[in-house]
Amino acid sequence: MNTGISPKQDDASNSNLLNIGQDHSLQYQGLEHNDSQYRDASHQTPHQYLNQFQAQPQQQQQQQQQQQQQQQQAPYQGHFQQSPQQQQQNVYYPLPPQSLTQPTSQSQQQQQQQQQQQYANSNSNSNNNVNVNALPQDFGYMQQTGSGQNYPTINQQQFSEFYNSFLSHLTQKQTNPSVTGTGASSNNNSNNNNVSSGNNSTSSNPAQLAASQLNPATAAAAAANNAAGPASYLSQLPQVQRYYPNNMNALSSLLDPSSAGNAAGNANTATHPGLLPPNLQPQLTHHQQQMQQQLQLQQQQQLQQQQQLQQQHQLQQQQQLQQQHHHLQQQQQQQQHPVVKKLSSTQSRIERRKQLKKQGPKRPSSAYFLFSMSIRNELLQQFPEAKVPELSKLASARWKELTDDQKKPFYEEFRTNWEKYRVVRDAYEKTLPPKRPSGPFIQFTQEIRPTVVKENPDKGLIEITKIIGERWRELDPAKKAEYTETYKKRLKEWESCYPDENDPNGNPTGHSHKAMNMNLNMDTKIMENQDSIEHITANAIDSVTGSNSNSTNPNTPVSPPISLQQQPLQQQQQQQQQQQHMLLADPTTNGSIIKNE
């Protein structure tokens, strides 16, 4: 098909020369231009062509309003003649896609197909007179040219198709360098002479096959461009990237700086930095530097926090170790130097008397212990491997087998030893400080208890104690005062036996007065409370009976008296150890016995 135009003037009519299907979902900015821009496209470079498009976004709103008004006034505009200056240029106006014009009946579809066929035939038969037939409503706005004639302009969808064809044409010319000047006119003449051959060759051309997927007008424009030949008016073409992710085109990003900024900010887009506007490149690099600095600061802060936490943890561990070490040292010091609990004056006197009494003569061993020690050597000869528990069991078994006559000599020996012990004990206790005197109520109980027991022989200890408490409450206050005075005198005598705790003048300290007052108050409280009388009275009675039993035993052995003042404590302990060794070696020897039955 011979169009009669030069390759310099076919960039507005070529829709898609790379055999790529048209994507109608792409949205482009509605840029409107005069026809003179498309006629004079051969005298412009690609950069000038882009600069012209960058100046148009300000007029978009006004042109859209004009387009709406013209669509309402004239549904179709057609059969316009070109000026003599435009007869050498064949302008194609492809029909919009079916998504824009949706016919409601089959008759409208048939009319549209007939109009498209007439349009293609008119373009192929004549190069001088070009008539555009049956232009749809979407293309119904007109622009005034320099010659005064009205020509249809291009809407947004048509411009997107022309734009794709322009980029495709640039990429094709880049691979196939073309000739300029007279070479372009010679190619035009050869194309005019070979119209039929060009039409026949489009069926086998891949561009024609790709154009079949588009609308008929776009396919016709692609076939005309293939017939025109590879000649082009461009000698050096820029590197242009055709497609980009997320349906973003390189030229649209270059035309609108705001869209380029959005594309650079989107993580899913990958626009090359060379295609961005010059003013955005330093901004992006500065932003990246700021982000890197922020990341470095965050990392430094995290490292500092980790170091601080580690230091705190180490300090805590050191403090714990120091506390443990200090605690161990305190325990060792306590073990080496045990802390002696400070006792009151009364308690210290009682404890001192107990310790002194333990250092005195020991009680004699019983008849059973004397028998077991007498047969110990015999048992060791019979059972040399037997231990002490086994020997004691054998001795007890033999003791049970003895009759009373056989046990009598052992009991007589015990009586003689007891008489000796009693004499020595009494002499030793005279050297000891006296016992702490009992309170007034305990003195009254010790005196009245034998009479109460004779009067009530059938009653028990608790009932007898209650009777004594009732008599104490009924007692005359004058007699109670006498018991109190006797208690005070005995207490002073008891305190005088501990001169180291008195004042330098020999007067008792304040602790003794406190102890005396506590005993008096305790006696009065005991008399007021009947329940506490029973326990205290029973203990007092037991102490009295125990002292009487010791004093009334006639068979106590007599031994030479021993005084603590003559022998120090260490010598007495050594003597006790020697006596124990002697008993183990010879059980028949006389002396103090450690263990009682």
Swiss-Prot record:
Keyword DNA-binding attached: yes
Name this polypeptide is given: Intrastrand cross-link recognition protein
What organism does the UniProt record list as the source?
Answer: Saccharomyces cerevisiae (strain ATCC 204508 / S288c)
Biological process per Gene Ontology, one example term: negative regulation of transcription by RNA polymerase II
Per UniProt, the ranges with Basic residues bias are 351-361
InterPro entries, A to Z: HMG_box_dom, HMG_box_dom_sf, HMGB
Gene from which this protein is expressed: IXR1
- Residues within the DNA-binding region(s): 361-429, 434-502
Keyword entries, A-Z: Activator, DNA-binding, Nucleus, Phosphoprotein, Repeat, Transcription, Transcription regulation
Residue ranges under compositional bias (Basic and acidic residues)? 32-42
